[in-house]
């Protein structure tokens, strides 16, 4: 019977055990959750969890630091809530799992904010002081947002990469990798952003489409006799012509110093209206069509035969400054997918070009590098001096046309590198930088950094497993790491370098420690204000302070050193058990942390890596302002509750994209209500139950109660297995099924009659309540990691003397004898009950009965089903929720069926069963015999249900 109907009956005469609970049906989450956040903080719940966990094995989830800039968005919410679920579930599994949140504080975005607010001419000391203040303000804002989501952690003592101790330890980490021999200085093309005025890390580069001019350019013959010999000809049939390159970067032509051919590709000498052209043989037809020329192949030769031939610069006739020749070098990276099969080489602006030219004997001083840090050519560059390279593109094309070197020019849309902060195009630009060498062997010998890092990946568990190959291929193919940046707000590469040679001071390691001590006292400002004479005396005449700062990925990438073993070493430990971030961090934090730990420790800094996907809308589209499909976690928390966000995240397979929309949130809210209603039923029916006073020993429970506890214990074993593997969506799916079907649709449905109509203190009712007590103990704990607000709210009603559900560990259910057989038997009974329910529904549709209690059923069953049904005796009717039930034996499954008949008896006013003995006691004409017994005598005897 439903509570509603029971409540509508006059209760005074024949009361039933309908109880209430202070746990309301409506969650009213937006109003209640902030009160819990406040209470958790005021009562020091995180500290109480730490005290309760002390001495247990440690489990360290190390927080990848978000950047201290801007409001938190849905991606932040996904990340922090997943971490919170992991930490809470590990604490409840019997670990000491602290959570120390952190923030990444140095770097370009904050420097840009300070420039926007105060201009670009601030003294360095003021930039630093304002950057610190800005980062602190942003952290406090984000902290409030994270706490509102129900994330528990050491919010009073987070780590910040700008804290003095962290800055100092980062300098010490730099000293470690220098000592081991991984760091070198060199000229090399690096990702360069003109707006940043600095080198960029690989992780700071994003790709988007850009339209540029694409050009085919001829470099005229400089050595016609040698060229003829290379093609096996006595002489060239005509003097005009040359070799043809294709490029999408016209601005690099002024800096050309070589041409690259593949040694094995066959090149053709083609006679055309524009002279003799050298093009890869397999590209001749396409190129002739593109150039609108007709051509005849005169001779062919493999690339190896053309090595070291020289050709005139294509602007040689336009200005004397370009009167130089370009040699042919061989390179395996040349392809014939597009273009001409010939690559022009400007070593200052391409990694492969640079490596090729250096390997052919070119020195750093030989390299032509006319592009300045702001994207303009040096003033002295012939024809184009002072122009920005992007403005120069069309002018270079016109100059080539005027010089007679241009064969074709058209617009070309291609995927091109952009700065992730400024969204502007970047280039490779050769600059003098500090690098960590991927293929460097440490001074002590052993494996290279690349080899060590790849071994570290092999030793790491990945969730999901595909992350391993992704990170492996990135490390296997990455270039040396550019450690240096040309900024102010960052940890300094606190070296003294020789003014003439650029060499490090011989006491560099000792000096780094001296600087670290000063930074520990007063921050990186100590380096800015340091007079070199304080540390190196008269050597200051020969050595100067290095002005570079460390890549911010080195800041966060060394948190395993300056947090796990530095600022928070008392709480944390190395290596961490888990790093958990979005899939972009294979290029970012996972990557830089692996490299720094491989250099410092010769191993990965983590035992496991968990990767989650990004949020998309209901149609699978990325969230963007232009589409207007973004969802703000603050808005959802204030409208529906943070619990709904938590349940959405936990119920979604985070290994792929996480789809969210109003429709999805509506479904999640409905699922939440089902769980909440289950908890309300449990708490209401336990409100007059005191475990110490009323609990029934397990061997005296009714059979269905033993089944329910055995089933719940088995389910919990499955759930804990999922929690251990960080599989949260199966936990949610199974718990929702458990609440709606196993409990709501079966066990609690069957239990209502016993709970409401049995004598309040009868063994039958107390057996049910004892089982419900154990179920509630178990359920609240497995819900707590993701439904944290609701589990805590229910726990305070259930166990008011306890501080919090979060200091508990997963519940140890009482042992039920023969649990496996019992679960198997009741699976059969539930199967039969499903058939009975279907038959009752058909009878109701045909207007033969009203409620199921108006029915009497005969179940025709065979084999194990017959045995299971008959074992329940007269209690079978309670399981089927009918007023009477009988079992008829048949030979086999084919003859099994259910007969439904309407009862011919009166309905009991109290229990609503239709029974022959209604009115058997004249003074209670509307009461059945069992209700009379339950109210006025010793109560009915029930053994199974």
Curated annotation (Swiss-Prot):
Motif 'HIGH' region in this chain: 66-76
The name this protein goes by in its record: Isoleucine--tRNA ligase
Keywords per UniProt: Aminoacyl-tRNA synthetase, ATP-binding, Cytoplasm, Ligase, Metal-binding, Nucleotide-binding, Protein biosynthesis, Zinc
Principal location: cytoplasm
Residues that, per the record, bind L-isoleucyl-5'-AMP: 581
Catalytic activity: tRNA(Ile) + L-isoleucine + ATP = L-isoleucyl-tRNA(Ile) + AMP + diphosphate
Classification via SUPFAM superfamilies: Anticodon-binding domain of a subclass of class I aminoacyl-tRNA synthetases, Nucleotidylyl transferase, ValRS/IleRS/LeuRS editing domain
């Amino acid at each position: 019977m439903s509570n509603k109907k029971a409540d509508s009956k006059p209760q005074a005469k024949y009361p039933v055990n309908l109880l209430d609970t202070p746990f309301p049906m409506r969650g009213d989450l937006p109003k209640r959750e902030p009160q819990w956040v406040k209470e958790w903080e005021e009562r020091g719940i995180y500290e109480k969890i730490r005290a309760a966990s002390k001495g247990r094995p440690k489990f360290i989830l190390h927080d990848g630091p978000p950047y201290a800039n801007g409001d938190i968005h849905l991606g932040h919410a996904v990340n922090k809530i997943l971490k919170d679920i992991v930490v809470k579930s590990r604490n409840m599994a019997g670990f000491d799992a602290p959570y120390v949140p952190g923030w990444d504080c140095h770097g370009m975005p904050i420097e840009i904010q300070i420039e926007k607010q105060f201009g670009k001419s601030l003294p360095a000391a003021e930039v630093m002081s304002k950057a610190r203040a800005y980062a602190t303000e942003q952290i406090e804002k984000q902290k409030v947002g994270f706490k509102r989501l129900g994330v528990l952690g050491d919010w009073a003592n987070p780590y910040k990469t700008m804290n003095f101790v962290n800055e100092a330890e980062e300098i010490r980490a730099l000293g470690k990798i220098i000592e081991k021999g991984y760091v070198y200085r060199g000229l090399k093309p690096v990702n360069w952003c003109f707006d940043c005025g600095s080198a960029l890390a690989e992780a700071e580069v994003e790709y988007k489409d850009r339209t540029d001019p694409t050009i085919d350019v001829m470099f005229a013959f400089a050595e016609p006799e040698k060229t003829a010999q290379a093609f096996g000809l006595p002489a060239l049939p005509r003097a005009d012509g040359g070799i043809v390159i294709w490029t999408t970067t016209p601005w690099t032509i002024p800096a050309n110093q070589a041409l690259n051919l593949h040694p094995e590709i066959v090149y053709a000498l083609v006679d055309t209206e524009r002279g003799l052209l050298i093009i890869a043989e397999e590209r001749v037809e396409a190129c002739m069509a593109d150039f609108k020329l007709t051509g005849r192949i005169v001779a062919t030769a493999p690339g190896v035969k053309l090595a070291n031939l020289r050709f005139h610069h294509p602007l040689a006739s336009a200005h004397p400054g370009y009167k130089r020749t370009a040699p042919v070098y061989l390179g395996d990276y040349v392809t014939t997918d597009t273009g001409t099969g010939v690559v022009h080489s400007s070593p200052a602006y391409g990694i492969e070009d640079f490596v090729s030219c250096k390997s052919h004997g070119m020195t750093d001083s030989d390299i032509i590098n006319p592009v300045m840090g702001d994207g303009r050519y040096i003033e002295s560059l012939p024809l184009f001096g002072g122009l920005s390279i992007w403005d120069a593109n069309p002018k270079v094309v016109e100059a080539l046309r005027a010089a007679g070197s241009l064969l074709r020019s058209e617009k070309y849309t291609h995927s091109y590198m952009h700065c992730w902060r400024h969204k502007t195009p970047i280039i490779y630009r050769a600059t003098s930088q500090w690098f960590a060498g991927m293929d460097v062997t440490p001074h002590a010998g052993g494996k290279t950094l690349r080899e060590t890092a790849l071994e570290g990946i092999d030793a790491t568990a990945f969730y999901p497993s595909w992350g391993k190959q992704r990170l492996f291929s990135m490390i296997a193919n990455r270039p040396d790491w550019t450690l240096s940046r040309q900024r102010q707000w960052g940890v300094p590469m606190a070296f003294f370098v020789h003014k003439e040679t650029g060499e490090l001071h011989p006491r560099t390691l000792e000096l780094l420690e001296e600087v670290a001590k000063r930074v520990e006292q007063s921050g990186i400002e100590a380096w800015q204000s340091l007079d070199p004479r304080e540390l190196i005396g008269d050597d200051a005449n020969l050595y100067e302070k290095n002005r570079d700062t460390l890549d911010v990925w080195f800041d966060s990438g060394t948190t395993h050193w300056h947090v796990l073993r530095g600022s928070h070493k008392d709480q944390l430990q190395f290596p961490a058990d888990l790093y958990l971030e979005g899939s972009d961090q294979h290029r970012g934090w996972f990557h830089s942390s692996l490299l720094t730990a491989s250099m410092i420790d010769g191993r990965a800094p983590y035992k496991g890596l968990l990767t989650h996907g990004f949020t998309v809308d209901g149609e699978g589209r990325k969230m963007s302002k232009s589409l207007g499909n973004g969802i703000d976690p603050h808005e959802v928390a204030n409208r529906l509750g943070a619990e709904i966000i938590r349940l959405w995240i936990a119920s979604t397979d985070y290994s792929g994209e996480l789809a969210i929309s109003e429709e999805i949130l509506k479904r999640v809210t409905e699922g939440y209500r089902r769980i909440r209603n289950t908890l309300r039923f449990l708490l209401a029916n336990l409100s007059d139950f005191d475990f110490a006073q009323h609990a029934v020993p397990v061997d005296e429970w009714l059979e269905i109660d033993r089944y329910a506890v055995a089933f719940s214990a088995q389910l919990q074993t499955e759930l804990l297995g999922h929690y251990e593997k960080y599989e949260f969506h199966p936990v949610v799916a199974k718990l929702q099924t458990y609440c709606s079907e196993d409990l709501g649709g079966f066990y609690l449905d069957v239990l209502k009659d016993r709970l409401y109509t049995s004598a309040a203190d009868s063994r039958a009712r107390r057996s049910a309540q004892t089982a419900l007590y154990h179920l509630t103990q178990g359920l609240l704990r497995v819900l707590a990691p993701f439904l944290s607000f609701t589990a805590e709210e229910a726990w305070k009603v259930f166990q008011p003397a306890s501080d919090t559900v979060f200091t508990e560990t997963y519940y140890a259910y009482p042992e039920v004898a023969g649990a496996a057989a019992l679960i198997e038997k009741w699976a059969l009974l539930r199967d039969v009950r499903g058939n009975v329910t279907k038959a009752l529904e058909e009878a109701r549709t045909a207007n033969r009965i009203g409620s199921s209690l108006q029915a009497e059923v005969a179940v025709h069953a065979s084999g194990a089903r017959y045995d299971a049904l008959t074992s329940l005796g007269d209690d079978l009717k309670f399981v089927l929720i009918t007023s009477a039930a009988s079992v008829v034996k048949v030979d086999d499954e084919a003859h099994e069926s259910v007969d439904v008949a309407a009862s011919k008896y009166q309905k009991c006013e109290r229990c609503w069963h239709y029974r022959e003995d209604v009115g058997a006691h004249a003074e209670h004409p509307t009461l059945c015999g069992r209700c009379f017994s339950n109210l006025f005598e010793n109560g009915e005897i029930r053994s199974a249900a």
